[in-house]
Amino acid sequence: MGSKSTVENGPVKVHVHLYYGVDPDCYRKDEDVGCLYGYHYAESEKMSLSYSRDHPEGRVLRTIRRGLKALLGCDLIHTYRNRAAVLQADVIWTHTEREYLSAALLLMLKRGRDKPLLLAQSVWLLDIWESLSLVKRVIFKKLLGRANLLTTLTTDNAALVKKFWNRDATVTLYGISTDDFPLQRISQWRPHAPLRVAAIGNDRDRDWQTFMAAFENDARFTARLATQRKVSQPSVADNVVIAPVLGLAEQRALYDWADVIVVPLRPNHHASGITVLLEAVMAGKAVVATGVGGLSDYFSSDAVAYVPVYDPRSLRERVAALGADPQGTTERIRRAQQELILKDLTTRGYARQHVMLTHKMLRHASSSETVSSLIRA
């Protein structure tokens, strides 16, 4: 590594490279929320942050950029537009493979030794790795070789990093914005009759069919499913309403309405549903989730009720059991909130993890360069 990896004068320069559409100058601009995922909390006298910017584009160029992104698995055009900020940094942070693959390519194409360090976080790539063509796997592994530190959101994904890429990965625990969802402590959980059950999300790994099969036409429950995805309803059920929620206010209103939040999932390894799970815990709601995706890294089974995958009966009876035991469910909700606080599952906590990892990367790079200098001498 060159001098960028061993910078000691002035603050460490970090470039936060996120996907097109979340430029902090534009994202929820009127609300002054900062950077999506809370990376801005890492800013200090010792660390300055720059962010990827959304360059204006017409319909034709937007179509081309999105097409290439879908074909290649990363947004080369967006990264190239931000190349100056990327290459001027000491360290680059990325949130998903869609950003780090293109950033890695840019670094590989840059001549010389004076290059930024790359923190590469994998989310979806490992779940689809075995389905990729041999050519893509070879190219992606080559690009992964440019990453100085690999991170994942779960131990499940970290295990796949070792299995598929023979590298170690550090788990960074995702966090929620306490401005959007302040902690609501409860004195006593009092369920409605019928029990109000809600599920929300647009993730491709949500299992809406199991959710509907669990609660439709059961008079013990009234259910709401909030998603922008098209959901087929096999039968007419007057106790299940399917409709999206638009905006943060409607989202909060859904949580206020519900007694229990359900996070139904298909098999995955990347903590699908973690955002909803965190929001529900902050809102003081009982949570039932499919026991997949590494969610147990975040909450124990004493805090969140986990059920088997594709099992509507288990889901239905688990929710019913919570409703039948208000005191036990109250204790479960309190325990979940305690675990969230102890693990600091907030955007501030998420940013702090990145600060610690960055200093670790710089120390390692400095040590490696010292050894290289001694060898050359």
Language-model-detected regions and their locations in the chain:
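Short hydrophobic beta-strand element within catalytic cores of glycosyltransferases
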Residues: I261, M282, A286-A289
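A charged, aromatic-enriched C-terminal amphipathic alpha-helix characteristic of glycosyltransferases
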Residues: Q327-T358
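Nucleotide-sugar-dependent
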Residues: A249, V263-L278, G291-V292, S296-D297
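Membrane-proximal helix-turn-helix segments that form the acceptor-binding/catalytic region
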Residues: Y80-Q88, L132-L149
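Acidic anion/phosphate-binding donor-loop and adjacent secondary structure
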Residues: A159, K163, I176-A193, P234, ...
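Conserved catalytic-core segment of nucleotide-activated headgroup transferases in glycan assembly
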Residues: G34, W189-V236, V241-A249
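Short acidic/histidine- and often glycine-rich active-site loop of Leloir-type glycosyltransferases
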Residues: P234-S235, V292-Y306
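Conserved acidic donor-binding segment of nucleotide-sugar-dependent glycosyltransferases
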Residues: N202, S301-R313, A320-Q327
